[in-house]
């Protein structure tokens, strides 16, 4: 009985030690971001997609022309050659009471309709900001 107990404990311990991570850390799009608050959980603004956008990888979100978008962060453009990206989620009745899929998209594709917060906080980006599940 005691031998079985020790075998079970060892197997459980090995199971906790050997955990797999399925996410992928992708290249950072920027070193700084602008947010409405210090945790970047409140929306900066609300906008409308002016054109379709197909996400090139898991960091980005698909947009369809006319969709409404909540904007949560604005990445700080590092140089003139770099694109300017915002992160947000598409508004739909399905996600009325919860936040939908959040991802990046080019800022040139979305027109802000309502700005909730004018004074934004500049914060450093982290690897988690560009993490793909």
From Swiss-Prot:
It holds the Pfam family SH3_2. The keyword Nucleus does not apply. InterPro entries: OTOR, SH3-like_dom_sf, SH3_domain. Residues 42-115 form the SH3 domain. Coiled coil: none annotated. Keywords: Disulfide bond, Secreted, SH3 domain, Signal. The keyword Metal-binding does not apply. GO terms for cellular component: extracellular region. Disulfide bonds join 35-40, 58-132. It is found in: Secreted. SUPFAM superfamilies: SH3-domain. GO terms for biological process: cartilage condensation. Residues 1-23 form the signal peptide. Belongs to the MIA/OTOR family. PANTHER family: OTORAPLIN. This is Otoraplin. It comes from Aquarana catesbeiana (American bullfrog).
